[in-house]
Regions:
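Hydrophobic, aromatic-enriched interface-forming segments
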Residues: 166-232
């Protein structure tokens, strides 16, 4: 993006921000240099790769929609890559240009010819990258709005993006919340790339898919049984974190109900699941923003009350994971026994 165009965009964003403030629209996150004005698609660089979050429906919807948008804008089949948080943090950013979605904007992404379309909270300003950001919308919805500017919308996508948005933002008061949770659970159960292959990249095929009947049965039968069992099987990890042992049902909904009903003394509840590639994922939930801080300690990320982290590959089993988490999340007390200077050495008791 040349300097003249960049200056114009920032100027437009400044005007737009002023209008939003004047009419009491949703304010931008503090410090974020983001822009959502006019025909934003005309400002997007041609990407060498599109990178999205692998763990949920929002990442799937956002990634596939951006791939369609790139096809429309540049007549190119751009490679889609999906990452978990741990993999993403370790990934080198070698591409000259990229679109990143459903992954938090961070300093290393502030590169010329890079675009980030995301909704996670951030305090960073974009000086080189194009940042399209709104914490009040899912990543999928932000990407869909870009697609609509190029005539890529449809009633089927309207419906699917709405359901994905409701599930990702956990909009409990929306009348479609239960159904939206079933859609979101498809990715949790069948995994990102399996579902992508089944749909052949056509998101519309997900609407009213027969697998939703499986999700509905699991919700009606498994969730109540799982909730009752898990309530009695919460294991301490640290003073602030409890491990919810789950044997059946939708882990996220079970943990959410435990938090809502204050069935546990722990402000953060954690679940673990082992992927087919033997990697163990920790999912964290809270009510007052504590989950994200714990996830970041584990080199993960996400939202304030809904976060996740991939544990090191050396952690092979759930018991190993519990031991690892206890070591990382409990403050070490060695400094209390370590002499701080010569006076401490001479004053230390001798036996």
């Amino acid at each position: 993006m040349n300097s003249r165009l960049r200056t114009t965009l920032v100027g437009l964003w400044t005007v737009d921000r002023g209008l939003r403030s004047l009419f009491s629209f949703r304010s931008w996150p503090v410090g974020s240099d983001s822009i959502i004005v006019g025909q934003m698609t005309s400002c997007l660089p041609r990407p060498d790769v599109i990178i999205t979050h692998e763990s949920d429906l929002d990442g799937l919807v956002a990634g596939v929609l951006l791939r369609r948008l790139a096809q429309k804008l540049f007549n190119a089949e751009v490679r889609l890559e999906a990452c978990h948080y741990h993999t993403w943090r370790q990934r080198e950013l070698r591409e000259p240009s990229a679109w990143v979605t459903d992954l938090t904007f961070e300093q290393r992404l502030d590169k010329p010819n890079w675009a980030v379309i995301d909704h996670h909270a951030t305090e960073l300003k974009a000086h080189n990258a194009l940042l399209i950001h709104d914490i009040g919308k899912s990543a999928g919805l932000l990407c869909y709005e870009l697609c609509q500017q190029q005539g890529l919308g449809s009633p089927a996508l309207d419906r699917l993006v709405h359901l994905s948005n409701v599930a990702d933002l956990f909009l409990e008061d929306d009348p479609d919340f239960v159904l939206a949770s079933d859609y979101a659970n498809l990715v949790k159960i069948y995994q990102f790339w399996n579902l992508h292959a089944l749909l052949e990249g056509r998101l519309e095929r997900l609407l009213d898919h027969p697998l939703l009947e499986v999700m509905a049965v699991k919700r009606r039968i498994e969730d109540p049984l799982g909730l009752a069992w898990s309530r009695e099987n919460i294991v301490p990890i640290s003073p602030a974190v409890g491990f919810v042992n789950t044997v059946i049902g939708n882990n996220n909904l079970i943990v959410h109900q435990l938090l809502e009903r204050q069935a546990s003394a722990y402000p953060v509840l954690l679940t673990l699941f082992r992927r087919t590639n033997a990697v163990i994922i920790a999912s964290l939930r809270s009510r007052n923003g504590e989950a994200l801080k714990v996830a970041e300690t584990l080199q993960g990320g996400g939202h304030a009350n809904a976060s996740a982290a991939t544990l090191p590959r050396s952690v092979k089993t759930i018991p190993d994971a519990l031991n690892y988490l206890r070591q990382v999340l409990n403050p070490r007390k060695q400094e209390l026994a370590t002499p701080q200077g010569l006076s401490d050495i001479f004053d230390a008791p001798r036996g």
